[in-house]
A protein has these predicted regions:
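Contiguous, well-ordered alpha-helical segments that form the cores/surfaces of helical PPI scaffolds
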Residues: 37-42, 312, 329-332
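Residue(s) on the long, well-ordered alpha-helices that form the structural core
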Residues: 307-310, 314, 327
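Intrinsically disordered, low-complexity terminal regions enriched in charged/polar residues
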Residues: 1-282, 286-289, 294-298
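Activation segment of protein kinase catalytic domains, centered on the conserved DFG
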Residues: 293-309
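Catalytic-loop of the protein kinase fold
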Residues: 317-348
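AlphaC helix (C-helix) of the protein kinase catalytic domain N-lobe
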Residues: 216, 220-223, 314-317, 331
Length: 349
């Protein structure tokens, strides 16, 4: 949780009058909103979170914020300086009693053990070798130095969601980060399967929560083996349950939805605005080919080939053209919320 302090009673960037727009559009108040949005973006980028809290102190009033990938819920102004008002102190007291999951930490991500981190770094060094493949070396260097970027263990449920089918992956720094606190917030990681010790590509994102819209795994299965489509392993919505390694009890999420999903959209209809806010569900996929940012192409010919492959791959995913699929090619690429290009690294499955 972060706290932003602003002096002056006019620094509150929101109106509290139903007859006026909610957001104040003065230059200073727009700058204040931009500042707290930036803080929220950084917080949700560098930590594995499902949501986050923050506090804004604007002169003699305070506001509470709850951020997720759909937007932010903003409280009414709290006159914390007024004698007898304990709302802000009560929030801080309750926040102190919360556990990590209640504060918004992702319950499926853990600090890697020393042995897991060492195995991950050793596998990276073995694949890079002497660094003759410059593109591959840049990709694997993206995991960052172990002293500055702690290794994490990410646990992903297989489609059936059974405890014994949870797969663990070790990751470092992400290849690219989201620049907004809302939306898909796609992040890609070079990851090591803890079970096999092989390197894979793990994509973490938030897919739109729209009835009837299927996750990427559904469509990848339909075009499996097609040219210009990545070699897919598995993918699923991220569940709210924590799988205890001791085999003991699990911690359930909200009873109405077993998956990590946004809440801001559920309350957006109660306030001004004619557009319905779209919610998001946390989603992860794993491919057995590596991917690097689109701007790491080698030359103009490589870039043109990449764009051609993107068009072909997206047409297959969009229309699920199953007959007469071409055999896999060394380079494959796809785009869903972020562009990437396949490397010539060895297949890992």
């Amino acid at each position: 949780m972060f706290v932003e302090f602003k002096r002056g009673n006019t620094s509150d960037p929101f109106y509290n009058d139903d007859q006026l727009p909610f957001e104040k559009l003065f230059e200073t108040t727009c700058a204040t909103r931009g500042q707290i949005v930036l803080y929220s973006t950084r917080l949700q980028t560098y930590q594995f979170r499902t949501w986050a809290f923050s506090v804004g102190i604007f002169g003699n009033v305070a506001r509470l914020f709850r951020w997720d990938r759909a937007g932010a819920i903003v409280s009414e102004p709290i006159p914390y300086c007024k004698r007898g008002n304990h709302d802000l102190a009560e929030f801080l007291r309750r926040f102190d009693l919360m556990d990590r999951v209640q504060r918004g930490w992702d319950p499926t991500v853990f600090d890697a053990t020393r042995e897991e981190a060492a195995a991950f770094d050793g596998t990276i060094e073995a694949v890079v070798g002497e660094g003759r493949n410059v593109l591959l070396k840049k990709l694997l260097d993206s995991v960052g130095d172990k002293d500055n970027y702690p290794r994490r263990r990410v646990e992903i449920s297989t489609p059936d969601g059974e405890d014994e089918r949870v797969v663990s992956y070790i990751v470092g720094r992400s290849i690219a980060n989201a620049r907004s606190p809302t939306g898909r917030a796609t992040r890609g990681f070079v990851a090591m399967s803890k079970g096999t010790g092989k390197l894979v590509f793990l994509k973490d994102s938030w897919r739109p929560d729209i009835p009837g819209m299927m996750g990427e795994a559904h469509w990848f299965e339909k075009v499996k083996g097609a040219r210009s489509v990545s070699a897919f392993l598995h993918g699923s919505d991220v569940r709210c349950v924590v799988v205890r390694r001791s085999g003991a009890a699990r911690t359930p999420g909200p009873p109405t939805n077993p998956f990590q999903h946004t809440l801001t959209n559920l309350y957006s209809g109660d306030f001004c605005g004619v557009r319905k806010m779209v919610g998001y569900i946390h989603y992860r996929t794993v491919q057995c080919e590596f991917y690097v940012p689109l701007d790491m192409f080698k030359d103009s010919k490589h870039l043109i080939q990449i764009m051609y492959d993107i068009i072909v791959g997206m047409s297959l995913l969009s229309f699920a053209q199953l007959p007469s699929l071409n055999p896999p090619q060394p380079y494959r690429t796809y785009t869903t919320g972020g562009s990437s290009i396949g490397t010539s690294a060895p297949r890992t499955s």
